[in-house]
Amino acid sequence: MHYKKAFLASLLSSIALTAYAPPEPWATLTPSSKMDGGTTEYRTSFGLAVIPFTVTESKVKRNVISQINDGQVQVTTQKLPHPVSQIGDGQIQVTTQKVPPVVSHIVSQIGDGQLQITTAKNVVTKSTIAVPSKTATATATSTATAVSQIHDGQVQVTISSASSSSVLSKSKLEPTKKPNNENVIKVQACKSSGTLAITLQGGVLIDSNGRIGSIVANRQFQFDGPPPQAGAIYAGGWSITKHGTLAIGDNDVFYQCLSGTFYNLYDQSIGGQCNPVHLQTVGLVDC
């Protein structure tokens, strides 16, 4: 009888341990501090636009982030708003393209998840941007170049020349109409192929390929996994501030650092080719 009771106790303990699902180990990779009033849940897909510190609110330059395939996030070297793009590996990039003020470029993503912004030159047209929290609007020559994502997830904005087909088909970049906490995203931008599209779930950023937004060992912002890249510093603790900017912990200042024909994004300056920026969250619409 004694052995039978011991066996049953062991069996029940084993079942209890099996039922327990601990959180992902990388979910604990978060900053020690949080953004006051930050939103950690936003399940509707949104993009990011790079806003340099040199512009005023009345002439907002939004570089929409792109993402290359490996998940890296990149921004072009273009002197205007760029939607962040993402290349295939998850990197985020922004291009170095030069154009008149008041333009919106979405961050793109390349295939590996990197985010990039390119330096491409775009054809521009007259358009009006409604400035958030202001009654007046600023009219100027402007376009919206979406930041793309390559296959590794890098986010980029390229420096290749763009045609007039990339120009905004709508004349206004307007505040989005969202209920409750979704009002935190106040503007919209055109979505195109490669544009970084993400959601925020419990302080974790997830791109359209299911990869996790993280600050990796070299301080670069990109998307990998899951799990995130080995040696990642942060994989959680993301939020949207009450001003609509992306934050990691209590910090909403990022750096676009020149890398050839595009910028990569970092949470710290890594040298002389870096400039401080805000990453403005934008609602993505088909134009």
Swiss-Prot record:
In alphabetical order, the GO MF annotations are:
structural constituent of cell wall
Return the similarity comment. Answer: Belongs to the PIR protein family.
PTM: Covalently linked to beta-1,3-glucan of the inner cell wall layer via an alkali-sensitive ester linkage between the gamma-carboxyl group of glutamic acids, arising from specific glutamines within the PIR1/2/3 repeats, and hydroxyl groups of glucoses of beta-1,3-glucan chains.
What the protein does comes down to: Component of the outer cell wall layer. May be involved in meiosis and sporulation.
Tell me the InterPro entries matching this sequence: PIR1-like_C (IPR054508), Yeast_CWMannoprotein_PIR (IPR051153), Yeast_PIR_rpt (IPR000420)
Please identify the protein, giving its name as recorded.
Answer: Cell wall protein PIR5
Q: Where is this site: Covalent attachment to cell wall glycan?
A: Q72, Q91, Q114, Q154
Q: Where is the signal peptide?
A: 1-21
Site Cleavage: give positions.
R62, N63
Removed propeptide positions: 22-62
Which terms under GO biological process does the entry name?
Answer: fungal-type cell wall organization
Q: What is known of its domains?
A: The PIR1/2/3 repeats are required for the covalent linkage to the cell wall. Their number varies among different strains of S.cerevisiae.
Q: Which UniProt keywords apply?
A: Cell wall, Cleavage on pair of basic residues, Repeat, Secreted, Signal
* Principal subcellular localisation of the protein: secreted
Gene Ontology cellular-component annotations: extracellular region; fungal-type cell wall
- Tell me, what's a Pfam family for it? PIR1-like_C
